[in-house]
Amino acid sequence: FPIDDDDKIVGGYTNR
């Protein structure tokens, strides 16, 4: 699951 939600809206965990 996204900790640092960079692209969590689109479903891509960029930061984490």
Curated annotation (Swiss-Prot):
Its EC number is 3.4.21.4. Its main location: secreted. Its cofactor is Ca(2+). It catalyses: Preferential cleavage: Arg-|-Xaa, Lys-|-Xaa. Belongs to the peptidase S1 family. GO terms for cellular component: extracellular region. GO terms for molecular function: serine-type endopeptidase activity. Residues 1-8 form a propeptide. This is Trypsin. Transmembrane segments: none annotated. One of its GO terms (biological process) is proteolysis.
